[in-house]
A protein has these predicted regions:
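Aromatic-rich carbohydrate-recognition surfaces in CAZymes
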Residues: 1-71, 97-100, 104, 227-246, ...
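Aromatic (Trp/Tyr) and acidic
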Residues: 5-8, 82-93, 100, 157-194, ...
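Acidic/His metal-coordination segments adjacent to aromatic residues that form catalytic metal sites
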Residues: 1-12, 72-95, 154, 212-222, ...
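Amphipathic repeat-derived elements
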Residues: 8-31, 35-38, 146-171, 215, ...
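Catalytic cores of carbohydrate-active enzymes
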Residues: 50-53, 57-65, 69, 102-212, ...
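Long alpha-helical scaffolds in large eukaryotic adaptor/regulatory proteins
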Residues: 32, 110, 114-121, 240-243, ...
């Protein structure tokens, strides 16, 4: 853990990689317990949080409002990274919604992990940063329609209805209150949910293109403009259980049936990369996609946990 971060984490120059690294450690803590997690990864988390807080990342700036800012106008910096003519098809830039949801979650989780250690100053600083982040998250992203803007920059708020807002509800620690969480989740249910994943863009939004077909350039434009992604559905189902608890167990169970059926098509026993956003929801892209498989498997384990309560 004493090595530089660049020696430990692949693609550290991507703004969200460190945030997802903290999330991955958080999942390990659920399995192994906080004490063992702290012994194994505590120093790494300490280094990651300081790396971000000290503004040492080349494209992840912690602003005075407690929110993270990344420049993505000319180069794609999020998972929506398709390009056309050397430019991002979806130029998400500035305050990006899932970056800041992940940031709040990272602050809260790390503070809790270090709560019983001697580093009280570190914990107090994390808690203070989390409060500032939470105080400014909803005013920045939550709009008058009851969902989250996808990104905000220089006074502009992007109102495209995209699935990136689901992370603010699904993660263990949310900067939103209960009413806001329910509203965001319900928006995802109404406009983004399909039997094969969450759409990358609502059919009501400008530029909706649900069919991943045609030559490469045409597919690049459609890649994040309406296609459905199962790994996002994993977080959606987790959010359903977090907001509605036991009353959504049967609903989530029914959603999983669609993925069970998919195991007998394309590549037997696995799930393809993405699906068309409109019926009949044909599977497209790579015939097997690890993020989708792991996302659905995680929900299956989560269902087992709820069923055993």
């Amino acid at each position: 853990a004493g090595k530089p971060l660049t020696a430990k984490i692949y693609e550290i120059d991507q703004p969200d990689v460190l945030l997802w690294c903290v999330w991955a450690v958080q999942q390990y803590a659920k399995h192994a317990g906080r004490e063992k997690c702290n012994r194994k990864y505590g120093k790494l988390l300490y280094d990651i949080l300081h790396y971000i807080i000290d503004n040492r990342h080349p494209n992840l700036k912690l602003c005075e409002n407690g929110l993270l800012y990344s420049e993505g106008k000319d180069k794609a910096v999020t998972w929506m990274n398709s390009t056309a003519g050397g430019r991002p098809v979806v130029p998400r830039t500035g305050y990006i919604v899932e970056f800041n949801a992940l940031w709040y979650n990272a602050l809260m989780f790390t503070a809790k992990l270090f709560a019983n250690t001697d580093d009280t100053a570190f914990v107090q600083n994390l808690q203070m940063d989390a409060r500032v982040c939470a105080d400014n998250f909803a005013p920045m992203f939550y709009n008058e329609f009851g969902y989250l803007c996808d990104y905000c920059v220089d006074g502009y708020r992007n109102y495209d209805v995209r699935p990136n807002m689901i992370f603010a509800v699904a993660l263990d620690y949310s900067p939103l209150d209960k009413k806001q969480c329910k509203s965001v989740l319900d928006y995802c249910t109404k406009e983004l949910s399909t039997p094969k994943g969450l759409r990358s863009l609502s059919p009501k939004s400008r530029g909706y293109n649900p069919m991943y077909v045609g030559p490469q350039a045409q597919r690049d434009y459609a890649y994040h403009q309406g296609t459905a992604w199962p790994w996002l559905a994993g977080f959606y189902m987790e959010a359903c259980l977090r907001v509605y608890r036991m009353s959504r167990l049967s609903y989530v169970d029914r959603l999983l049936v669609g993925y069970e059926e998919e195991l007998f098509y394309h590549c037997i026993g696995t799930i393809p990369e993405l699906f068309d956003g409109n019926p009949p929801f044909h599977g497209r892209g790579a015939i097997s996609f690890a993020m989708n498989v792991s996302g659905i498997m995680r929900v299956v384990k989560l269902l087992d946990k709820y069923n055993n309560l």
